[in-house]
Amino acid sequence: MLKELRIKNFKGWKDTGTIRMAPISLFFGANSSGKSSIGHFLMMLKQTVESPDRKAVFYPGGKNTAVQLGSYKEIVFHRDPKNKISFDYCWELAETLKVKDPISDMIFSGNALAFQAEVGLDKKDQQTLILDRLNYEMLENDEKSLAIGMRRKSENRLDYIVESVRYKLKRKQGRAWYPAATVRFYGFPDEVVAYHQNADFVQELNLNHEKLFRSICYLGPLRTKAERLYSWAGNEPESVGYSGESTVAAILAARKRKISLGYKKTAKPFEEIIALKLQEMGLIEKFKVNPISEQ
């Protein structure tokens, strides 16, 4: 779960300041005060994590995504391409993360991770989006156990320097190569592991970051128009979709699932519960599903 969030130079925000997050966080303000931008930013990061393009620093969205934010110039503060979007957040881990240095045999542990990054346009062409730096901190009860990150070696090149605090990285013998492009906005590339003797744990950091954003869900109105006919090929969708486009498939996939509506109450089939709730809302009189083919 996110504990803190801070965003700089995103849409109408020069600096949000540190926002403390809770299981339920509510934002109040006048129209166009920037409330929605905070959610849009998180959804953009989620879309980027889930995007198949590992080299895309940000994925602002497309036809079937929660948000469509446009180009970098449309999302950066004051639409000034010289501004860089920076952000940091901290989140609790479901399980304690332990890192053992195979060289020193020291063990580092943490129950939370903090992340910072800065993104901007390449100074050469003012078109290419580039990650200038990223940094992870592993925290144990709010105390830093270790930190590791990457920053660009030069503004004119895409080579990165890997730096660490409280954890001594040891390079493998041979020429001192530098890692190239990062994985999206958050990920250490494979070269970091390949060039060092004790950097395997960075893959765990990548994985925990992806788990964080997979746990963040977009809640919004279902706006897909109802259709007369729906086809279902037996697939089991992960959700109903951002616009409800997979609602029918989700219902059909859960036909054999039973849910209890309370303590010591009989579990009922998923379809029956849907029908019951729709009737309680006065939206239907009858709910029935008949297969038109054996599948």
Segments (PLM) and residue ranges:
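Phosphate-coordinating catalytic segments in nucleotide- and nucleic-acid-processing enzymes
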Residues: 49-295
